[in-house]
Structure formats: structure tokens, C-alpha cells
Amino acid sequence: MYLLPLPAAARVALRRLGVRGLWDRGLSTADMTKGLVLGIYSKDKDDDVPQFTSAGENFNKLVSGRLREMLNISGPPLKAGKTRTFYGLHQDFPSVVVVGLGKRSAGVDDQENWHEGKENIRAAVAAGCRQVQDLELPSVEVDPCGDAQAAAEGAVLGLYEYDDLKQKKKVAVSAKLHGSGDLEAWEKGVLFASGQNLARQLMESPANEMTPTRFAEVIEKNLKSASSKTEVHIRTKSWIEEQEMGSFLSVAKGSEEPPVFLEIHYTGSPNATEAPLVFVGKGITFDSGGISIKASANMDLMRADMGGAATICSAIVSAAKLNLPINIIGLAPLCENMPSGKANKPGDVVRARNGKTIQVDNTDAEGRLILADALCYAHTFNPKVIINAATLTGAMDVALGSGATGVFTNSSWLWNKLFEASVETGDRVWRMPLFEHYTRQVIDCQLADVNNLGKYRSAGACTAAAFLREFVTHTKWAHLDIAGVMTNKDEIPYLRKGMSGRPTRTLIEFLLRFSKDSS
């Protein structure tokens, strides 16, 4: 028995009743637990018909050509990212979802700055796995589609949804590789995607749950389970005071939640004293704006203002799982930015760890204040590279939207490494200027050495980067402003609506490539 794709009304009924109800006459309950996702390419000029992937062609032969037959009579050829579901073709797979992969020849697109073929696979596999999830099947086998890592990323990222606090949850679907393809690449893709999903979970969690202390505990648990080559230091307020991090403390003092300075070490190099890479992440677990309070509309999204800390810590957890032969240190100043009688006031002057004084003209420009001290501290490790990530400015969202992470760097070498990694992952970056033009706007300050706002309203992302540069002496430093990529509405088809966890996979890929270059 085999069935055509169901019309909309029938699909609704199917989801209400459960797919098992269709099979009382044929398959046992044990057979009802597995779906299959297979790929098909768009027709090239030399093709008579659209071509299946290798796995798709093998399955079509297994069912005596019926999959091709059903595709031919069920509608027009599948476009990239579109799906079509068939039922009853094979007893091992009650539901088979065919997904459109676009052109087989798709590769690196120099205009889009990504690998189009890999992106097509991620989007198509995600769509197919969600179809299986909607049918309430607990497992799915996935065609590697010519790139098992991209397929795994599409499956794991596409199936993830934050429902930790809901009583009614979606069916948890276990995805595994179909056939005897490249299992190593598949597992690598699962690892990359799981790293991004950890960042998504941290960013999506409500601020009353994901406090600075709780954030540090979650990372400690994940890091210690990832590798024995790790250390976690959860620094308290007294340590922060000893380090004379006055800029960080000035933000934290407005909240009842105690601040935490999270310091994580992964020592993967055979030489434990080898200079590390240092990642720094902004960790504002809720940003009300402080005395310069934000508008209430969408303020709830500011639970994810610790996205920088979430992405850099998740990337280091993933690097530890990969057992990369390098040393990495992660630093995350964690606190809330709240209004109170103790909070920073516009016009206050605070002193950073390096002795520079800062005039705080807007308390909602707090991310740069906590990063200033963390960047100063990063230099004490004599690192090879310093990279910080932060949901820093609304101006970056205005400039690039969700299309790419903005990168400000004083090193073309470092820019090229980040860019190459982003092309591979599809989570893109775009270089932004670090001109002295912007530096002059933040050092033109009435009361202190530097102002936490630019002199003018224009180029807010650039003046924020210029501010951070005042606390950096290292010649290989990059600032990633991830404000524009913090959330996903519908722009990235393999991510559901919500917090994106970007650019975690690009950071993991950067670390992987750096480790290969070092060895």
C-alpha cells in the first residue's frame, strides 16, 4: 500500500489522530516510529528528470521505482527547501519526506559569501525533519545529501525548540544518519549544531531563571562533562573588587542579583603553558537600560543580552568536545542592568581596570562598560588572539540586520580567518570600520578620559567599537557585534523563531581551523 501526499485537511486530521491510525490494516506499532528524509536535486540542463541523491536513488530502487512514480504524479518538481511526504512506501519507514536540495552544482557564492549547496542542505533537511516531528514520529533517518555535516546541522538545528518550561512539549525526535555514509562528518555536524543549541537555550531562558549565577553553573556543568582538560572559576563580587573592575561593578550595583565573573579554561595543547586564545563575551542577563530605561515594547528580548557570553562559552564547550589541541580561555562578566537607588546615573564617572576613567552619559550603553574591564583582564594571559562577542548596539541591527555579524578588527589576518570560517558555516560575518574618525568621537569627553557614547548619534556601532578599542593593546583583536543576529524571525529557514545562538558555529569553525593551522 502507498498513499499520495495528503491534502491540507487530511494532514490536520492526521496530526490530531497520529499517524499510527492510518496503519491499522498494515503495519505494527513497532513500525510506526521512524521517518525517512531523502533529497532530490533540481533538474540540470543535462537531466531528463530531477535526480535523487545516492541514498534517494537506492531507496527508489528498493521500492521498485514507486517513489519516483509518486513524485511525478503528485505535483511539480520540488524547489529548494520544499518538501513532499509519502506514506506506506516501505514497512520500515511509514513516512518518507522528499526534500528539494536545489542544484547539485551549487557551491561557494562569492556574492552571498556562503556555500549555497551547504545552506540548501541545512534548510531542506530541517524542513523534512520538522515534517516527521509534526507526524509525532520519535525518530528519523536522514539522507547525508552529499554533505553529512550540513545535513546533521540542518536536522539538529531545525528540530530544536525551547519548550523547557512548557507542560505540553513537541515530540522529541532523534535524528540519525541514513545508510553507511560519512558518520564522522555527521557526528561533527551534530556537535556543531548542539553547540549552537546550547547558546539558544541560554539566550531563550527567562531572566529570573538564567541569573548570572545560574548561567555560570550551566556552563560549568557542560564544560566539565565535555572534557577533563577544563577548569572553571566562578569569581564573586569580592574578587571583582580586588581586580579593580570599577566599570563592571558600576553596572552590576543597580541589581539585587550578585555579579559573577566567569573564567573558563580549556587546556588542549600538549604544552600547557602555550599562549591561549581568549574569548570574551558580554553577559548582561537582563538589560532594562538602567536609569536610561528602555521602552517597554520588546524589553523581554533583553533576557538574551548575554548572547555574547552564551556564544563564546558554547563554542569553547564544543572545542573541548572536539579535543582541539589548543589552549582557550573564556571570560564572561555577568550581571543585570537595572534601575535602582544604587544604579549608575547619567553623568557618573567610573574607573576601569586599566585606570582609564569613563563618563557614563547613557546607562543603557552598559555592555561596553563591562567588556572594558574584561578586555583589560584578557591581556594578562598573553594571548595569541582576543575575540569578544556582544549584543552591543541597536545600530548594528539597523546597519546589517540579521544578514551577518558585524566584525571590527585591527588585524586583517584575523578578519580573513573569521570570514573563511563563516563561509563554511553559512553564519556570515561582515567587516566594519575601526577608523580614528570614530575614536575621536568617544575621547572628546568633558569629565573623563572616554565617554560611553559617541559625540554624535550617527554610527553607533562604530563608536561602540572605538570605545572598546581604548581598552585593547593587542594587535590581533576582533569585536563581534551580534545584536542584529540575536533573534531569528523567519530569515534563517533551519532555525525556528526565537533566539538564534549565532554565530556559535562560526566561532567553532574558527577554532577548528586555528588548531589545524597551529599543528
From Swiss-Prot:
The entry's Mg(2+)-binding residues are: 287, 364, 366
Q: Which InterPro entries match?
A: Leucine_aapep/pepB, Macro_dom-like, Peptidase_M17_C, Peptidase_M17_leu_NH2_pept, Peptidase_M17_N
Q: Which CDD domains match?
A: Peptidase_M17 (cd00433)
Q: How is its activity regulated?
A: Bimane-S-cysteinylglycine-hydrolyzing activity is inhibited by o-phenanthroline or bestatin, and is activated by the addition of zinc chloride.
A GO-annotated cellular component: trans-Golgi network
Residues involved in Zn(2+) 2 binding:
282, 287, 305, 366
Name it: Cytosol aminopeptidase
Residues annotated as carrying N6-acetyllysine in the record are 221, 455, 489
**Which species does this protein come from?**
Rattus norvegicus
Fetch the Gene3D superfamilies from UniProt: Leucine Aminopeptidase, subunit E, domain 1 (3.40.220.10), Zn peptidases (3.40.630.10)
Question: PTM Phosphoserine: at which residues?
Answer: 42, 54, 180, 194, 238
Binding sites annotated in the UniProt record for Zn(2+) 3: 202-203, 303
What does the UniProt keyword field contain?
Acetylation, Aminopeptidase, Cytoplasm, Hydrolase, Magnesium, Manganese, Metal-binding, Phosphoprotein, Protease, Zinc
Which cell locations does it reside in? Cytoplasm
State one molecular function term (GO).
carboxypeptidase activity
* Gene encoding the protein: Lap3
Residues where N6-succinyllysine is found: 45, 61, 103, 221, 455, 476, 489
How is this protein organized at the quaternary level?
Answer: Homohexamer.
Q: Where does Zn(2+) 1 bind?
A: 287, 364, 366
